[in-house]
C-alpha cells in the first residue's frame, strides 16, 4: 500500500512587530529585511523536494514567507491558497502590547499560562483550543485528501496555529501542548497516515535570531 505524500510546515519568519517584541496576533505586519532573507534560506532547506500545493494564512507575514520560499526554489507555478483558518491566534486586548512589559504586569506564571496553555482566555481574544477548532478541520477536510492523493503539501502559518496543528498530527495531549514549540527558521517534514497523523518526522533548521 502506498503511503500518503509529504506534509511540510513552516512558521513565518521575523515580522516588524516580532522585532519590536510586540504581540501581533490577528494584526497584519510585514516581514523585516532579515525576515525576507531568512525565509529564502528556509526555502533552501527544501531543495530537491517537489511541492504540489502550498497554503498560507491570509496575513501578509505568512504570505511573504511562503512567496520567498517558493521563489528560492524557483517554484512559481505551485498553486498557493491563502486561508483564514491558518491565521494566527487573536490576542484580543493584548494585541499591539509589548509582551515583555505584559509579563511584568501579569506576572511570570500567568504570562506563561496565556502564551502556552490550551484553554487560557484572553480578553476579547482566542484560546489555543479555539485556534485548534478552526485549524484542524481545515487540515482534515482540505490538506489530508491531498496527502492521501500522494501530493507534497507546504503550509506556512504562525506559531500558535502550527502548535495547534502539530498537537493533532503528533497526538499531543492538552496538558503537554504547553511544551510544544514551532521555532523560527525551522521546517518540519511529516510522513503521515491516512488520517493525517504522523508516521515519521524530520526537522530542518537554519540559524535564526528572532525576538519572539
Which positions does each model-derived feature cover?
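Beta-strand elements within well-structured catalytic alpha/beta cores of enzymes
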Residues: 6-10, 55, 81, 151-157, ...
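A polyampholytic, Gly/Pro-enriched intrinsically disordered region
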Residues: 98-110, 196-211
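Active-site-proximal alpha-helix that buttresses catalytic centers in soluble enzyme cores
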Residues: 5-75, 105, 124-135
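Short, well-ordered beta-to-alpha junction loops that form the rim of enzyme active sites
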Residues: 57-59, 85, 116, 151-152, ...
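Short glycine/proline- and acidic residue-enriched helix-loop micro-motifs
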Residues: 110-130
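Phosphate-coordination/substrate-recognition cap region in phosphate-metabolizing enzymes
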Residues: 2, 40-111, 169-183, 187-189
Amino acid at each position: 500500500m502506498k503511503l500518503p505524500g509529504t506534509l511540510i510546515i513552516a512558521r513565518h519568519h521575523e515580522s516588524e512587530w516580532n522585532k519590536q517584541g510586540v504581540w501581533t496576533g490577528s494584526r497584519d505586519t510585514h516581514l523585516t529585511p532579515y525576515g525576507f532573507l531568512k525565509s529564502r534560506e528556509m526555502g533552501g532547506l527544501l531543495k530537491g523536494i517537489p511541492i504540489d500545493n502550498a497554503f498560507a494564512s491570509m496575513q501578509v507575514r505568512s504570505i511573504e514567507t511562503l512567496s520567498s520560499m517558493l521563489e528560492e526554489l524557483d517554484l512559481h507555478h505551485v498553486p498557493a491558497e491563502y486561508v483564514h483558518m491558518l491565521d494566527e491566534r487573536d490576542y484580543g486586548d493584548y494585541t499591539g502590547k509589548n509582551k515583555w512589559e505584559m509579563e511584568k504586569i501579569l506576572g511570570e506564571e500567568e504570562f506563561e499560562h496565556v502564551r502556552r496553555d490550551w484553554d487560557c482566555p484572553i480578553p476579547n481574544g482566542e484560546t489555543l483550543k479555539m485556534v485548534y477548532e478552526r485549524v484542524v478541520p481545515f487540515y482534515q477536510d482540505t490538506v489530508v485528501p491531498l496527502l492521501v492523493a500522494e501530493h507534497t503539501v507546504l503550509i506556512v502559518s504562525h506559531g500558535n496555529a502550527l502548535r495547534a496543528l502539530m498537537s493533532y498530527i503528533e497526538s499531543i495531549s492538552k496538558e503537554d501542548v504547553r511544551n510544544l514549540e514551532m521555532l523560527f527558521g525551522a521546517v518540519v517534514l511529516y510522513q503521515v497516515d491516512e488520517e493525517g497523523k504522523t508516521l515519521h518526522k524530520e526537522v530542518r533548521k537554519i540559524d535564526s535570531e528572532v525576538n519572539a
